[in-house]
Every structure is written in structure tokens, then in C-alpha cells.
């Protein structure tokens, strides 16, 4: 009985560890890919904003636009990583 219990626990743990490493790998891969995409978008946006007059840039800075862009980019990356991990595990269909 103890041997059977040890086999069942060993199988469950090995399956869990394998799935955990798989999900972490998919999450990291997705995060790295999307980070490059969002950084590329923000790098394209930056030259467009630097061509604006200084008083408009000051108003945008006071309004918190640079921080808002950073927050939105981070939220997109976080949500995409979570969704890809869930889809790979099978939680999302």
C-alpha cells in the first residue's frame, strides 16, 4: 500500500513539475517576444512625439502621458503572458 501511494505521489509530482516548467517556459518566451514588440512600438512613437512643439510636450508630460504609455505597455505584456500560459495549460479553450 505504501509503495502504491509513493508511486501515485511521485507521478503527480513529476507531472506537476513538468507542467510547471513548461508553463514557465511558454510564459517567458511570450514575454520576451511581446516585450520586443511593445518596445519597438514605443520606439516608433518616440520620434513622432519629439517633433511636437515644446509646450505640447510639456502639457503631455504634466498629464502623465509617458507614464500612461508605460503602464499600458506593461499591462499588455502581463495579460498576454498570463493568457498564453493559461491557453497552454488548457484552462482557456
Curated annotation (Swiss-Prot):
Transmembrane feature ranges: 25-45, 56-76
GO terms of biological process kind: symbiont entry into host cell
Topology class, membrane: Multi-pass membrane protein
Highest taxon in the source lineage: Viruses
UniProt cross-references to InterPro entries, sorted A to Z: DUF2523
Endpoints of the signal sequence: none
Predominant subcellular localization, coarse grouping: virion
Keywords: Host membrane, Membrane, Transmembrane, Transmembrane helix, Viral penetration into host cytoplasm, Viral penetration into host cytoplasm via pilus retraction, Virion, Virus entry into host cell
A GO term from the CC aspect: virion component
Subcellular location as annotated: Virion; Host membrane
Function: Plays essential roles both in the entry of the viral genome into the bacterial host and in budding process. The formation of the G3P-G6P complex termed adsorption complex is essential for correct termination of filamentous phage assembly.
UniProt similarity note: Belongs to the inovirus G6P protein family.
Subunit description: Interacts with G3P; this interaction is required for proper integration of G3P and G6P into the virion.
Official protein name in the record: Head virion protein G6P
Species of the source: Pseudomonas phage Pf3
Amino acid at each position: 500500500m505504501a509503495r502504491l501511494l509513493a508511486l501515485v505521489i511521485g507521478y503527480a509530482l513529476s507531472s506537476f513539475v513538468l507542467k510547471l516548467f513548461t508553463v514557465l517556459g511558454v510564459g517567458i518566451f511570450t514575454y520576451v517576444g511581446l516585450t520586443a514588440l511593445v518596445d519597438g512600438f514605443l520606439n516608433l512613437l518616440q520620434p513622432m512625439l519629439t517633433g511636437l512643439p515644446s509646450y505640447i510636450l510639456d502639457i503631455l508630460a504634466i498629464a502623465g502621458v509617458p507614464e500612461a504609455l508605460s503602464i499600458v505597455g506593461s499591462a499588455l505584456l502581463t495579460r498576454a503572458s498570463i493568457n498564453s500560459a493559461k491557453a497552454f495549460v488548457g484552462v482557456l479553450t
